[in-house]
C-alpha cells in the first residue's frame, strides 16, 4: 500500500491511500511520527485535485495488479490506528461499498458529513486503546 501524507506539527495527516486491496489498514507511525489525523475527503472519490504530499510505502506490501486510489467504491474496510485523533469532513463521502470501520476510543473529532453517502456501512468497531 502507498500512502500520501503531510507532516503537521511533528504528526502525520493521511491525505490519500493507494493499493490493490479494498481493505485499508493504516499504520500507527510513518517515519517515526504518529498518524493522528486523516484529511477531509481522504477516502472520497469526489475530491478535486491533489495536494502537495509526501509518499510512504508499506515495507511488507507485495501486491498483484496495479495500485489504484482507495476511495469511493474501491474501499470496503478501513482500520485506523490507535494513534488517530481526528478524521476530516466528508472523509468517506460517497463510499457506498464501505462496510466496516475500526478505530479506538482515542478518536476525538469527526468532521461534518463524514458518513455522507455511506449506505453500505454495516459495522463500526470502537475498541479501547491498547
What residue ranges belong to the model's regions?
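Structural signature of tandem-repeat unit edges
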Residues: 1-10, 18-36, 48-86, 96-109, ...
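Consensus positions within tandem repeat domains that build extended binding/scaffold surfaces
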Residues: 41-42, 88-91, 111-116
Amino acid at each position: 500500500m502507498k500512502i500520501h501524507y503531510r507532516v503537521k506539527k511533528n504528526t502525520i495527516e493521511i491525505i490519500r491511500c493507494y493499493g490493490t486491496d479494498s481493505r485499508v489498514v493504516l499504520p500507527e507511525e510513518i517515519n517515526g511520527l504518529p498518524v493522528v489525523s486523516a484529511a477531509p475527503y481522504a477516502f472520497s472519490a469526489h475530491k478535486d485535485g491533489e495536494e502537495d504530499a509526501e509518499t510512504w510505502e508499506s515495507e511488507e506490501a507485495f501486491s498483484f495488479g496495479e495500485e489504484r486510489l482507495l476511495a469511493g467504491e474501491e474501499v470496503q474496510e478501513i482500520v485506523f490506528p490507535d494513534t488517530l485523533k481526528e478524521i476530516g469532513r466528508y472523509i468517506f463521502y460517497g463510499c457506498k461499498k464501505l462496510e466496516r470501520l475500526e478505530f479506538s476510543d482515542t478518536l476525538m473529532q469527526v468532521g461534518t458529513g463524514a458518513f455522507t453517502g455511506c449506505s453500505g456501512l454495516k459495522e463500526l468497531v470502537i475498541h479501547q486503546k491498547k
